[in-house]
Curated annotation (Swiss-Prot):
It is found in: Cytoplasm. Belongs to the MnmG family. TrmFO subfamily. Its cofactor is FAD. One of its GO terms (cellular component) is cytosol. This is Methylenetetrahydrofolate--tRNA-(uracil-5-)-methyltransferase TrmFO. It comes from Anoxybacillus flavithermus (strain DSM 21510 / WK1). Disulfide bonds: none annotated. FAD binds at residues 7-12. PANTHER family: GLUCOSE INHIBITED DIVISION PROTEIN A, METHYLENETETRAHYDROFOLATE--TRNA-(URACIL-5-)-METHYLTRANSFERASE TRMFO. Its EC number is 2.1.1.74. InterPro entries: FAD/NAD-bd_sf (IPR036188), MnmG-rel (IPR002218), MnmG-rel_CS (IPR020595), MnmG_N (IPR040131), TrmFO (IPR004417). Catalyzes the folate-dependent formation of 5-methyl-uridine at position 54 (M-5-U54) in all tRNAs.
């Protein structure tokens, strides 16, 4: 039997891989390049459109635990990410072009996968995984709305500008990771209070791209436009993306008033993205505002920040923790449209949907990952949260099943969560 997977983003690619490696034939549909989205630039699978960072790689962070669980489950996304990582302190960042090319190659070359480059405008019959992402095309969105009977929720993800390293005035900046964790991987642009005030005034008065009347302004906190943060007040920036804590200037030994960080975006180290500066400003306005950042006065912007709609379904009402649609047992959903937020989380949901679609086809019992694991905690959250107030969520230890013992020290507590998660996933592998 064959399974149809719609969408070759992180979730769809992972789902197709998990099915194929279990001997299931997969028909993988991807509409790019026949039909592009407002945010994608290539026809590659698993294209990273926001940041090139897959976030923390350490086991004291929930997303670090999630990655390690996925490695143990032979994730194609983690194989590709680990093989084309770039320096990023304690985080896992990748060369986005190499990463997408690697995922495309591995999935396409699998003998059980057939790739079809066309738009899907209706929900197929037979075993299907829908992983069309936050930018699902209008015809399919309408079909999904008809299927679910639920109103869609809208919010906007925003991507940060990328600049050429050669154009940065290195005399005005310094290289350092916060609290000197890992290798010194970030370019830091320090600001005095006066410089910050000038930057802030320019930012809050800059012109944004107008939103359509019918689109509600709901932003996910983890990817909020810098100008929206700024309008909440100066402290939102100073305690957010521009916080100077742990970034003392090695040339003076003093902590700057504010710091703008740049993170390496490609393996060659020629491109850097401005961390936390996802934006919906007009391109001309972006250029003007960036000029107020010390060291970036003459910066060459190779990609301006863009903003796009994000769409997700009301998973607590519609899905089981297997990522299976409650009203149709051979239909699965995966990726950001389920309300998991983040690259790694999306891929992990695809992994679960792929495994369970394989089990469905093979007549095996579907699996619910334990809430003690990062993978299971995400599946539990999106299917058990209050449907009236459901919002997307990143992986975090707050979603894990509580520990049996009381541990006050946060680091030790997180280490215990991680230890328990990896013990649990190791035992759980026997069911797969």
């Amino acid at each position: 039997m064959e399974v149809t997977v719609i969408g070759a983003g992180l979730a769809g690619s992972e789902a197709a891989w998990q099915l194929a490696k279990r001997g299931i034939r997969v028909k993988l549909y991807e509409m790019r390049p026949v039909k592009q989205t407002p945010a994608h630039h290539t026809d590659k699978f698993a294209e990273l459109v926001c940041s090139n960072s897959l976030r923390a790689n350490t086991l004291t962070n929930a997303v670090g635990v999630l990655k390690e669980e996925m490695r143990r489950l032979d994730s194609v996304i983690m194989k590709a990410a680990d093989s084309c990582s770039v320096p990023a302190g304690g985080a896992l960042a990748v060369d986005r072009h190499e990463f997408a090319a690697k995922v495309t190659q591995m999935v396409t070359n699998h003998p059980n996968v057939t790739v079809v480059r066309e738009e899907v405008t209706s929900i197929p019959t037979g075993p299907t995984i829908i992983a069309t992402g936050p930018l699902t095309s209008q015809p399919l969105s309408e079909q999904l709305q008809a299927l679910t009977g639920e109103e869609y929720l809208y919010f906007y993800d925003a991507a940060a500008p990328i600049v050429e390293k050669e154009s940065i005035d290195m005399e005005k900046v310094y290289i350092k990771s916060r609290y000197d964790k890992g290798e010194a991987a970030y370019i830091n642009c320090p600001m005095t209070e006066e410089e910050f005030e000038r930057f802030y005034d320019a930012l809050i008065s800059a012109e944004t791209v107008p939103l359509k009347e019918f689109e509600k302004e709901i932003y996910f906190e983890g990817c909020m436009p810098i100008e929206v943060m700024a309008r909440r007040g100066k402290k939102t920036l100073l305690f957010g993306p521009m916080k100077p804590v742990g970034l003392e200037d090695p040339r003076t030994g003093k902590r700057p008033f504010a710091v703008v960080q740049l993170r390496q975006d490609d393996a060659a180290g020629t491109l850097y993205n401005i961390v936390g500066f996802q934006t919906h400003l007009k391109w001309g306005a972006q250029k003007e505002v960036i000029r107020f950042i010390p060291g970036l006065e003459q910066a060459e912007i190779v990609r301006y920040g863009v903003m796009h709609r994000n769409t997700f379904i009301n998973s607590p009402k519609l899905l089981k923790p297997t990522y299976q649609y409650k009203e149709r047992e051979d239909l699965f959903f995966a990726g950001q449209m389920t309300g998991v937020e983040g690259y790694v989380e999306s891929a992990a949901s695809g992994l679960v949907a792929g495994i369970n679609a394989a089990h469905y086809v093979l007549g095996k019992e579907l699996v619910v990952f334990p809430q003690e694991t990062a993978i299971g905690s995400m599946a539990h959250y999106i299917t058990s949260a209050n449907p009236k107030h459901f919002q997307p969520m990143n992986a975090n230890f707050g979603l894990f099943a509580p520990l049996d013992e009381m541990i006050k020290d946060k680091k030790k507590k997180n280490e215990r969560y991680a230890e328990r998660a990896l013990e649990t996933i190791q035992n759980f592998l026997k069911k797969l």
